[in-house]
A protein has these predicted regions:
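Double-stranded RNA-binding/processing signature
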Residues: 1-249
Length: 249
C-alpha cells in the first residue's frame, strides 16, 4: 500500500463509508472533513495482505474481534436483559460469527473496496474469508476513529435486531448440535455421531471438510464446511430441517 492515498481512493472510501448510513453526527463530521489519519485507518482495514505484507487489515481485524464481541454484549444487554448468561453466550456466538461477518460484508458490498494482490484476486476459495475478515477490520477501524464503542452499536444494533429475531424463532439455526442432542435424548435415541473427513487442503474452502451424522448407525445427513465445527453445525441444521419437514421434530 502506498504511503500517499490518491484522491480517487479517498473518494472511494468516503463513498463507501457514507453508504453504511451510520446515524452519528460525529461520524458524519469526521468523514466530511476527510481526516487523514481516519482515511488511513479505513484504507488499511480495506487492504489485504496479498497487496501489502506490512500495512494491511490483519491488526485491525484482530482489534475488531474484541470490539465486535463487546458491541454484541452491549446489544444483548439492552435488547434481551432477561436472558441467562448461557443464552447470551449462544446468541452472541452467532451474531459475531465468521458466517455472520461474511453475510454483513456482502450486504454492504465491501468486496468492491478491498484492495487485493494478484494472488488473492484469483482465489475464489478465499473470497468469503477475505470479505469476513475485512468487515471485522472495518469494525476495528470504526472503533479506533473515536476510541468509543458508540458508533459501532449505532451501526450494528438495527442489523442485530433483525437477525436475532430470526435466530431466536428457530434456535436450531444457531445452536443446531445442542438442539439435535436434546431431540435424540427426548426420543431415547443414541446421541448423534459426527464423522468428519477432510476432502480439500485449501484454507477457506467452504467444502474443505465433509460431515456425516449417524444415529443408531444409520447416516441421516451430510454437509460441508470450511472447518470441522462448521461442517458439523451445517449437517446438524440439515438434519433438523429434515425432521421438521417429515414431522418428526
Amino acid at each position: 500500500m502506498k504511503n500517499i492515498i490518491n484522491e480517487k481512493r479517498i473518494n472511494q472510501i468516503i463513498a463507501f463509508l457514507n453508504s453504511l448510513k451510520i446515524q452519528s453526527k460525529r461520524f458524519s463530521e469526521i468523514i466530511k472533513k476527510q481526516n487523514a489519519s481516519v482515511i488511513k485507518d479505513f484504507n488499511q482495514a480495506l487492504t489485504h495482505s496479498s497487496d501489502d505484507k506490512i500495512i494491511n487489515y490483519e491488526k485491525l481485524e484482530f482489534f475488531g474481534d474484541a470490539v465486535l464481541r463487546l458491541a454484541a454484549s452491549n446489544f444483548i444487554e439492552k435488547k434481551y436483559p432477561q436472558m441467562s448468561v448461557g443464552e447470551r453466550s449462544e446468541l452472541r456466538a452467532q451474531i459475531v460469527s465468521d458466517e455472520w461477518l461474511t453475510k454483513l460484508g456482502k450486504k454492504i458490498n465491501i468486496e468492491k473496496v478491498i484492495i487485493k494482490g494478484p494472488k488473492a484476486l484469483g482465489d475464489e476459495n478465499s473470497k468469503n474469508t477475505i470479505i469476513g475478515e475485512a468487515t471485522e477490520a472495518l469494525i476495528g477501524a470504526l472503533y479506533k476513529c473515536f476510541n468509543s464503542i458508540k458508533e459501532v452499536n449505532l451501526w450494528l444494533d438495527n442489523i442485530w435486531e433483525e437477525d436475532s429475531k430470526i435466530l431466536l424463532k428457530a434456535p436450531y439455526k444457531y445452536n443446531a448440535k445442542s438442539v439435535l442432542q436434546e431431540w435424540c435424548q427426548s426420543k431415547s435415541l443414541d446421541l448423534p455421531v459426527y464423522k468428519i473427513v477432510e476432502v480439500s487442503k485449501k484454507n477457506g474452502d467452504p467444502k474443505r471438510f465433509s460431515c456425516d451424522i449417524l444415529i443408531k448407525g444409520l447416516k441421516e445427513s451430510s454437509a460441508f464446511g470450511k472447518s470441522h465445527k462448521q461442517a458439523e453445525k451445517n449437517a446438524a441444521k440439515i438434519l433438523i430441517e429434515k425432521f421438521i419437514t417429515t414431522g418428526k421434530y
